[in-house]
């Protein structure tokens, strides 16, 4: 298993690739084209540019998180077939760029939810956490 770090991409992450490169053992990032909307096709040249930026920093791309599945696909609207075609072409373009891992984002609406965004750990660091019992029930 390789140690990787999530990087949101140029202009979307306060942590730079130079900083990530300084973390011992980290040779790759999990990244995305953050500005792309669900259902939109990722063009080969956009993927190549993202890959170039990461590789120029001395890192590799271990995978993509995520090529979002549009709500149009999920509920079968008139745009679903177009979005499915865009999804297929995006996966093909990622494969052609030698990126073979895509994490599927299954979370609806809010993308991710945690009950705490800064739970303090024993060493004083913080991490996101989820405790089901702290959520309101109806």
Label the model's feature ranges.
Residues 3-5, 27-31, 61-65, 102-104:
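Hydrophobic faces of well-ordered beta-strands that scaffold small-molecule active sites
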Residues 6-10, 32-35, 66-69, 106-109:
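Active-site beta-loop-alpha junctions enriched in small/polar residues
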Residues 11-21, 84-91:
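Short, acidic/polar
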Residues 17-25, 45-62, 95:
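Acidic (Asp/Glu)-rich catalytic clusters
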Residues 33-46:
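Glycine-rich, proline-tolerant flexible connector loops at the mouths of alpha/beta enzymes
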Residues 41, 68-85, 110-122:
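Surface-exposed, active-site-proximal loop segments in enzymatic domains
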Residues 81-102, 106:
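An active-site-proximal structural segment forming one wall of the substrate-binding cleft
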Residues 131-137:
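Conserved small/polar residues in nucleotide/adenosyl-binding loops
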């Amino acid at each position: 298993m390789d140690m990787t770090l999530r990087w949101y991409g140029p202009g979307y992450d306060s942590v730079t690739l130079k900083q990530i490169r300084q973390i011992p053992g980290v040779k790759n990032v999990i990244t995305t084209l953050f500005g792309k909307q669900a259902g939109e096709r990722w063009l080969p040249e956009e993927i190549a540019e993202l890959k170039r930026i990461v590789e120029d920093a001395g890192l590799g791309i271990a995978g993509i998180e995520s090529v979002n599945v549009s709500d149009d696909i999920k509920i079968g609207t008139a745009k679903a077939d177009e979005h499915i075609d865009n999804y297929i072409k995006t996966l093909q373009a990622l494969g052609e760029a030698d990126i073979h891992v895509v994490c599927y984002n299954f979370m609806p609406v809010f993308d991710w939810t945690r009950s705490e965004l800064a739970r303090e750990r024993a060493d004083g660091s913080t991490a996101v956490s989820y405790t089901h019992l702290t959520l309101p029930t109806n």
